Amino acid sequence: MHDDDEALALHALGWILADEPRAERLLGLTGLSPDGLRASLGQRATLAAVLSFLAGHEADLVACAAALDIEPDRLAAAAHRLEGPESPERIHA
């Protein structure tokens, strides 16, 4: 895993949380509570969920990438790496 992916996920999370409806949608879709999100910020699965949330909503993905001054595909690629099969925390459905 790239440490940059974790940093990128945290920056993206900051962008998400700056907008209350978007933050509520993240919590609703991930099933996390605000306390649960805070407690799990160091976990790869949580960071992957943050980036996957963006990757699943193209308008948010593009807007977040613009705000972070990066290409949207960097966010999507980071999500893919964080979700990778090498992750011991990956939840298999």
Which residues does each predicted region cover?
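Metal- and O2-centered redox machinery and metal/ROS homeostasis
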Residues: M1-A93
